Amino acid sequence: MSIVVLRLVCAASLFAAASLGRAAELLSAGHRPKPPGVHALVGAKVFLNPTTALTNATVILRDGLIEAAGRDLPAPADARVWPASNSVIYAGFIDAYLSIASTNPPVSTMHFDPVDGLTSGINFLGVESQEKARTQPGAGYEVASVTPHARVARDYAPPAKTLEALRELGFTAGNVVPAHGIIRGSSAFVNLSDAPPNEVILRADTHQHIALESQEVYPKSLMGTIAVVRQAFADARHYVLDQADYRAKPTARKRPEFNPALDALAPVLNKATTVVIEPGSVLMGDRAGHLARELGLNFAVVASGHEWRRPDLMKAVDAPFIVPLNLPSAPKLPDEDDWLDVSLDQLRQWDWAAENAALLRAQGLEVALTTHALTDRKVFRKNLRLALDRGLAEPGALAALTTVPAKLCGIADRLGTIEPGKIANLTVVEGVGYFDADAKVRQVWIDGVPFETQPARKPADVRQLTTKAEPPPTGKKSETPNVVSNGGKAVTPKVDKSVAATKKAELTALQKQRVAQSPNASRGALLTPRSVLIQNATVWTCGPQGVLTNANVLVVSGKVHQVGFFKPQLSSDTLVIDATGKHLAPGLIDCHSHTAILGGVNEGTLPSTAMVRIADVVNSETENLFQQLAGGLTMANLLHGSANPIGGQNSIIKLRFGAGPEGLKFTNAPAGIKFALGENVKQSNWGDRNTTRFPQTRMGVPTFFENRFTAARQYQNAWAEYRRKGGVPPRTNFELEALGEILNGTRLIHCHSYRGDEILAFLRVCERFSVRVATLQHVLEGYKVADEIAKHGAGGSCFTDWWAYKFEVWDAIPYAGSLMHARGVNVSFNSDSSELARRMYLEAAKGVKYGATPEPEALKFVTLNPAKQLGVDKWVGSLEPGKDADFTLWSHSPLAYNTVCEQTWIEGRKYFDRAFAAQRAETLAKERADLIAKAKKVASLTGGGGEGAAAAQTLFFQRALEKLHELGIAECLECRLNQKSQ
């Protein structure tokens, strides 16, 4: 009996010892004793949360947790007491988007055979292997940059210097994010102590991460990137269904493949895991919101720094924003003329940048701050001070460092505020508080362990101040003058503190005041009357009424109400325009445009990219829209490029300058897609490295079309069988979905084409599949096969007078448009150029010059005919009752060489007025001159240097994604117009 009791006692003792944990273990001889686990920080100002502060308060920590916080708390007898009467204590700061490069997974050198079956996804014959971009070895997704199964927690091994730098800024924890790819993998939330990784990881899989950026192989465009994300989530949904079906009946069906990438997306699909999207630009931020809602995701967004451009769109995103504080700084330029090449947009970005965080909070959005994108983290507090000076309130800033990131990272029950039971992470600041520029972070506490960030000066450091002055070891002259006293000691020269204080005050005052205006201030409709009467004009209706002299047009509620010779009954709010001596015409339509496309016109990696969508990357911010309005253009067909036989889906827009991407889109338009023939698609001039992708010959192109149409038909058959029999649905394939719409007649083909023989072969392939081609684009040899084109029912959207600019257009002639028109082909003229799109009316006039097309018919080449080709003539293209009131007012005939577009209206709203355009240019020129003056003054006060100066000045010269492809003339408008105002 006694033996049994003894065993029970021993067992109890062992259990008790084990329950004490590592902190109570007796260390072996020679180890430094562990510090006490109980601490009392006494006499500090303590922020329990961003809006509640206690003075002369005490915070008690025990065994890594907060035990108590409040006034008049006695320090426990077993506590080490830390006097903190000159300190402010905050909940430990949290970086919600922490980049540490050492977490990148290794690159794989394994390869796989890219040839797959007929209905393959991206594995077309001869395309560049994804393996060169693969970072996750082993099983995974077909696109190498999709690695949701990558886990930061697996490879977390931060450099000690990185942790130290973050602690010096007051950060105690952070969410470490993966750094590469599109769907990048899961982040890990960690404490920023020096303890082993196993001890500091608080959440192993915090978020899933997506970056909207292009890659070395497919996808190489932003629209391709979005297509990859869309397809990956569709595949994940199918994968979940397929795996569940197999688990239910493993002996009755074929085993599905295991895919760790798709498996890792399951928690995202059921909203158990939040997705953090890094879009890279303001419009991609807008697209991130649309994409996340389309996919049904819980999401947050990493700010690009350009949200100031469209706060209205950011408000509609309606998600938390993680905001980096990487701000551009004004440089000192070596020559005064160098400022001529600095655009207004670059100056605006510099002046707005510090206000970005405050602006997002003003939209009612949650904001967390991060050190992400800073090449030198030391500038974080300086940039935070600038953000505070520009409207970010201190409680909001404190929330952005504590409660908001804690909530966003799912750790608010353990971090973010100072209250009993939470992890003992604290940030201790000397002086009046963290947001004072001169205050120092004294120490941080992580898991109840103190880390000194301002160590006391060592005796050796003191002695160094009294050593003899010596030249720098490099032999260069010291930048700081040495003054030697009688004792032979080096003495630091005195600085005139009053001068320094004056300069600092002047700089602060300059930086607080924003000079830059919002881009939207000079955009949008100039007039929005309920009704408009244009009277006594020569009206080119482009409809059955033809050309009317001294006629009237009445517009009501954005629609054409009456056209002709009538006595109008006007309401009191009708705007009357006397157009005596002027010409009124429908708004011009460009049937082939690449004007407003973000992140690449081509997804040229694969021979078929029917899954990519121009609608995902419409650029509403480009100044090209304003310039084209000045030429009378009101509608454009935005097309994918011609790098592959089957390109991406088109998007038809109205030039409602000032609206966002969704506001530009003409939603009544039928869906369309770009196809292409000729040299481009067979990679004739792509260089010796691009000679393997099928097709490589002209005869291979029709074969490829037959292959993809057949694949689409098989895909449709598979879905039809599923609807009859049930079971697991087929995998959604967005390429074949789009091609199936062509077979169904609900998506129109717009095909880049030059040679007559290729055009004929293409039409025959389409006819075998009962597909009618909507337009043959460029169609320079269309005059050779005009009868066949007319019989098929295709339109011809031509270049006017382009010929002999490459071998396959050697037989092009400027009479092609008129010749095809005479043979019954519906002909339009297009630009294929943002510059040419500003003068489509002169392109129409070439139809008169080359081929003697009657003037009213020639004008239809850029109005009614392209509307018919695009399937939108029910709404636009002519001035007829019931159609949209899209019209232009001209000084002379719209086909005259000396005509000037005076006004452009869309849906009864005036978007361009020549008189306003001159005022606008003057206003923008003055704004630019004022910004240059401010930048020069700031640069002179800062010396153009300091911590992080090189990176910040590089950022100053970067151009926004939305502005990368502006015409040179746009830069003239922004940089050189009215230079005397400088």
Model-inferred region functions:
Residues 7-18, 22:
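Bacterial N-terminal signal peptides
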Residues 132, 274, 320-430, 518, ...:
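His/Asp/Glu-enriched, well-ordered alpha-helical/loop segment
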Residues 44, 407, 419-462, 537, ...:
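C-terminal cap of metal-dependent C-N hydrolases
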Residues 44, 64, 86, 97, ...:
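Divalent metal-coordination and catalytic microenvironments
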Residues 25-37, 46, 50-92, 102, ...:
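Histidine-rich, glycine-flanked metal-binding segment
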Residues 71, 93, 103-108, 186-189, ...:
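Short, solvent-exposed loop/turn and secondary-structure capping segments
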